[in-house]
């Protein structure tokens, strides 16, 4: 009896649980239906040319016309076509002028107050364009790299601000009519958190870093004039297009892939296939390596359904060379018929999202997760890679408490949330203000996102999660460092760590290397302290479904 009593007394207490799950369904945020269609291009000049040739061939006249026609140079179709719209802000009335109807409808339902609009009209336009970008909604995520000589990039949609002295502001907002996927795209908007992350192996992680423009574009904020009798400022946007690179043919891509992937039948090397995710262009399985007994995740992608096949080649090549203990690493790849099989590490503990929404973490556990993530970020940043999607959904946990950033996102088509992307591009709760406002940015956008993720670990959700998506974007762009619900409950060194991560001034924001030396990380508990939380989160998740 005494032994039984001793056993009960020595049993560790259950991890603290959140009273209610803070996970919000992605479908709860309805910002209205977005129309991503664009105006049709002018008639193809080639058609008119063919008709003219036909009429000249049947009508009497000088036959030398044919000879002259052959000598005429071929005139190519219009390229880099832009449709320009004009948006201004009247400081007297507090109204935008010339705003597209679609934007006006979004703004009307955004819960951004009139006083907020008048206080920072430029931020309103920034977030409207960011939210409503048709390219953003269709963009795919792929691994990206920065130039060693330039940490920051100037967005191709940077702002030029000019004063208008006579009429209300009517500056151009460039709206690209060319939907070619190869064009440089603005920073993509991160989709809202789904109701439950079945498997973050179905997510893509690294997003494309837009190409540095050929010339610098001045970026400066606007503010309404203090004197209402003076004309409002002009809000000007310029779009610069990059030169298109020649596309690789499907056969060239297959030939290159054959030279990269392993030879052999993966069905003989791996066994016990179990499906854990299904998407538009592929399926994700767990499997067992016959030789080593290691459990792995295998992405099976139909190459015909991948929009940017050539980028997959670059990802495989780079991932083979970039291995790190804090990253879910690439292991192998195979061509099986029309499918590309990519083998990755598998972590059975699930995502950090389950832990932050179902349990309560203490500072020592939060410090341990932050340290592991910073080690991964220091590695990525030193290799000129910006992650740009740091959030709890993209942190995987092992049952031993190991913490790893998810893999380099081979194909966004695999994610099951694609149905929402056409009508709701989502709110980037973790995204740095400089990305939302399309300013120059570099690796420190990941540090901001890490700070937001630390707030997730404290409060169970990121700031502004329950705001209208457009207003959340506005608050990210204008509010600066988000406020904590109960900052007095945190230690001074934790508050300082958060302030270093969530510094609006990018120059003052800490780098991954600097923050690894922060005093807060010295209180980190062993990674094994996360195991009870992982087990408790798994149990709670099982009971919720």
Curated annotation (Swiss-Prot):
Residue ranges, annotated region (Disordered): 1-77, 159-198, 211-251
Cellular localisation: Cytoplasm; Cell junction, Focal adhesion; Cell projection, Lamellipodium; Cell membrane
Subunit field text: Homodimer; homodimerization results in autoinhibition. Active as monomer. Interacts with GIT1. Component of cytoplasmic complexes, which also contains PXN, ARHGEF7 and GIT1. Interacts with NISCH. Interacts with DVL1; mediates the formation of a DVL1, MUSK and PAK1 ternary complex involved in AChR clustering. Binds to the caspase-cleaved p110 isoform of CDC2L1 and CDC2L2, p110C, but not the full-length proteins. Interacts with ARHGEF7. Interacts tightly with GTP-bound but not GDP-bound CDC42/P21 and RAC1. Interacts with SCRIB. Interacts with PDPK1. Interacts (via kinase domain) with RAF1.
Comp. bias regions, Acidic residues: 174-184
Impact after mutating residue 423 to E: Constitutive kinase activity
Lineage: Eukaryota, Metazoa, Chordata, Craniata, Vertebrata
SMART domains, A to Z: PBD, S_TKc
Descriptive protein name: Serine/threonine-protein kinase PAK 1
Post-translational modification Phosphotyrosine, affected residues: 131, 142, 153, 201, 285
Species assigned in the record: Homo sapiens
Residues bearing PTM N-acetylserine: 2
PTM: Autophosphorylated in trans, meaning that in a dimer, one kinase molecule phosphorylates the other one. Activated by autophosphorylation at Thr-423 in response to a conformation change, triggered by interaction with GTP-bound CDC42 or RAC1. Activated by phosphorylation at Thr-423 by BRSK2 and by PDPK1. Phosphorylated by JAK2 in response to PRL; this increases PAK1 kinase activity. Phosphorylated at Ser-21 by PKB/AKT; this reduces interaction with NCK1 and association with focal adhesion sites. Upon DNA damage, phosphorylated at Thr-212 and translocates to the nucleoplasm.
Known outcome of mutating residue 86 to L: Abolishes interaction with CDC42, leading to strongly decreased activity
Pfam families per record: PBD, Pkinase
Function: Protein kinase involved in intracellular signaling pathways downstream of integrins and receptor-type kinases that plays an important role in cytoskeleton dynamics, in cell adhesion, migration, proliferation, apoptosis, mitosis, and in vesicle-mediated transport processes. Can directly phosphorylate BAD and protects cells against apoptosis. Activated by interaction with CDC42 and RAC1. Functions as a GTPase effector that links the Rho-related GTPases CDC42 and RAC1 to the JNK MAP kinase pathway. Phosphorylates and activates MAP2K1, and thereby mediates activation of downstream MAP kinases.
Modified residues (Phosphothreonine): 84, 185, 212, 219, 225, 229-230, 423
Residue ranges of every copy of the Protein kinase domain listed in the record: 270-521
Biological process per Gene Ontology, one example term: regulation of MAPK cascade
Disease tied to this entry: Intellectual developmental disorder with macrocephaly, seizures, and speech delay: An autosomal dominant neurodevelopmental disorder characterized by impaired intellectual development, poor speech, postnatal macrocephaly, and seizures.
UniProt keyword Kinase, yes or no: yes
């Amino acid at each position: 009896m005494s032994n039984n009593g001793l056993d009960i007394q020595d049993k560790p207490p259950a991890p603290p649980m959140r009273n209610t799950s803070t996970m919000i369904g992605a479908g709860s945020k309805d910002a209205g239906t977005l129309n991503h269609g664009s105006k049709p291009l002018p008639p193809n000049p080639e058609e008119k040319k063919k008709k003219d040739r036909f009429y000249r061939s049947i009508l009497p006249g000088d036959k030398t016309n044919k000879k002259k026609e052959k000598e005429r140079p071929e005139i190519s179709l219009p390229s880099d076509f832009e449709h320009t719209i004009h948006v201004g802000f009247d400081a007297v009335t507090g109204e935008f002028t010339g705003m597209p109807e679609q934007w006006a409808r979004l703004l009307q339902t955004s819960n951004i107050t009139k006083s907020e609009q008048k206080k920072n009209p430029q931020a309103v336009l920034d977030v409207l364009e960011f939210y409503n970008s048709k390219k953003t909604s269709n963009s795919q995520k792929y691994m990206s790299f920065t130039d060693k000589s330039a940490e920051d990039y100037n967005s191709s949609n940077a702002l030029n601000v000019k004063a208008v002295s006579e009429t209300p502001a009517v500056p151009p907002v460039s709206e690209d009519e060319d939907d070619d996927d190869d064009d440089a795209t603005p920073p993509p908007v991160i989709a809202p958190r789904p109701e439950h992350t079945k498997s973050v192996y179905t997510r893509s992680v690294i997003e494309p870093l837009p190409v540095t423009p050929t010339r610098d574009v001045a970026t400066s904020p606007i503010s309404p004039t203090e004197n209402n009798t003076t004309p409002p400022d002009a809000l000007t946007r310029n779009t610069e297009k990059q030169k298109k690179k020649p596309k690789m043919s499907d056969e060239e891509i297959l030939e290159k892939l054959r030279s990269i992937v392993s030879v052999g039948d993966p069905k003989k090397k791996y066994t016990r296939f179990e499906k854990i995710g299904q998407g538009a262009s592929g399926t994700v399985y767990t499997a067992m390596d016959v030789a080593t007994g290691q459990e792995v995740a295998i992405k099976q992608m139909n190459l015909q359904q991948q929009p940017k096949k050539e980028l997959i080649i670059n990802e495989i090549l780079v991932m083979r060379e970039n291995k790190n203990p804090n990253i879910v690493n690439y292991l192998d790849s195979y061509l099986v018929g029309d499918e590309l099989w990519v083998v990755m590490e598998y972590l059975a503990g699930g995502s950090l999202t389950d832990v932050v929404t179902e349990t309560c973490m203490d500072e020592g556990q939060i410090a341990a997760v932050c340290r592991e993530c910073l080690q991964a970020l220091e590695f990525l940043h030193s290799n000129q890679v910006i992650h740009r999607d740091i959030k709890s959904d993209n942190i995987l946990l092992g049952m031993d408490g190991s913490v790893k950033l998810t893999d380099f996102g081979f194909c966004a088509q695999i994610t099951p949330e694609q149905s929402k992307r056409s009508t709701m591009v989502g709110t980037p709760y973790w995204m740095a203000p400089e990305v939302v406002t399309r300013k120059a940015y570099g690796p420190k956008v990941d540090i901001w996102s890490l700070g937001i993720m630390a707030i997730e670990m404290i409060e169970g959700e990121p700031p502004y999660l329950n705001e209208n998506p457009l207003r959340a974007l506005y608050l990210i762009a204008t509010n600066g460092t988000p406020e904590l619900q109960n900052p007095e409950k945190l230690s001074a060194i934790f508050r300082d760590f958060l302030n270093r991560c969530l510094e609006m001034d990018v120059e003052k924001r800490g780098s991954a290397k600097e923050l690894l030396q922060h005093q807060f990380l010295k209180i980190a508990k062993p990674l094994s302290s996360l195991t009870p939380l992982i087990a408790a989160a798994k149990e709670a998740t099982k009971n919720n479904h």
